[in-house]
């Protein structure tokens, strides 16, 4: 009986420590500390799609699978998306869920980065090619999603600048093409900004 009680006490203590750790506010991180944190998981990465011309391509210059002639990545966007994905794999950063805008340029970013098992999410979309407005329901979905921190992996959301700036004006007014916000728990049930990573910085991160 005593042995069983001691075992239960140890289990309860371990659960309390785990919950406390997950509720503790995340710290601003960079360099090795950032990579180490991402390797342990528990973060949500919100990324703008890689570099894309503002004009949709003509039929002659469109990618073969871009049947709707949507905006697509330029050469720099394609190269940096590939490099980002390669860095994530080489750094052994675990990726769990991946959600992406259904736009072609976002899907192309995810495909070239080879992010695992992506799912399109309408709320991450751009409200049409004009980018003139993002519905409040989209911003609410994004704000809620970034508070759902995974255990042992990281969630990636690929979307657009108006969505990110609209949902998180306290952290950012604009992002460069492909830039990522790394969000962690704020200790109060919400999210806080841990780091900003420009897409060209991923290959320079080391562990």
Model-found features: residue ranges?
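Bacterial N-terminal signal peptides that target proteins for export
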Residues: 2-12
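N-terminal signal peptide c-region/cleavage motif recognized by signal peptidases
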Residues: 21-23
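Active-site-proximal alpha-helix that buttresses catalytic centers in soluble enzyme cores
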Residues: 28-120, 127-130, 136-137, 171-186, ...
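Histidine-centered catalytic micro-motifs
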Residues: 47-52, 157-164
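Short, solvent-exposed loop/turn segments at secondary-structure junctions
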Residues: 128, 165-166
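A short, structured loop/turn motif at beta-sheet edges
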Residues: 148-153, 186-189
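Generic beta-sheet signal
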Residues: 42-44, 151-159
């Amino acid at each position: 009986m005593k042995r069983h009680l001691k075992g239960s006490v140890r289990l309860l203590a371990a659960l309390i420590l785990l919950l406390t750790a997950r509720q503790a506010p995340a710290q601003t991180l960079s360099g090795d500390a950032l990579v180490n944190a991402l390797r342990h998981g528990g973060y949500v990465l919100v990324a703008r799609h890689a570099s894309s011309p503002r004009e949709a391509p003509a039929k002659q210059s469109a990618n073969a699978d871009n049947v709707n002639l949507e905006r697509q990545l330029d050469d720099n966007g394609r190269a940096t998306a590939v490099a980002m994905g390669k860095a994530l794999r080489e750094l052994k950063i675990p990726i769990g869920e991946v959600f992406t805008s259904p736009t072609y340029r976002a899907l192309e970013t995810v495909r070239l980065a080879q992010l695992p098992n992506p799912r399109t999410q309408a709320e991450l979309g751009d409200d049409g090619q004009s980018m003139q407005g993002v519905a409040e329901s989209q911003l609410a979905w994004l704000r809620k999603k970034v508070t759902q921190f995974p255990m042992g992996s990281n969630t990636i959301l690929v979307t657009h600048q108006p969505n990110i700036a609209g949902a998180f004006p306290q952290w950012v007014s604009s992002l460069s093409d492909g830039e990522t916000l790394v969000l962690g728990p704020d200790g109060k049930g919400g999210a806080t900004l841990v780091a900003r990573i420009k897409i060209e910085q991923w290959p320079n991160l080391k562990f």
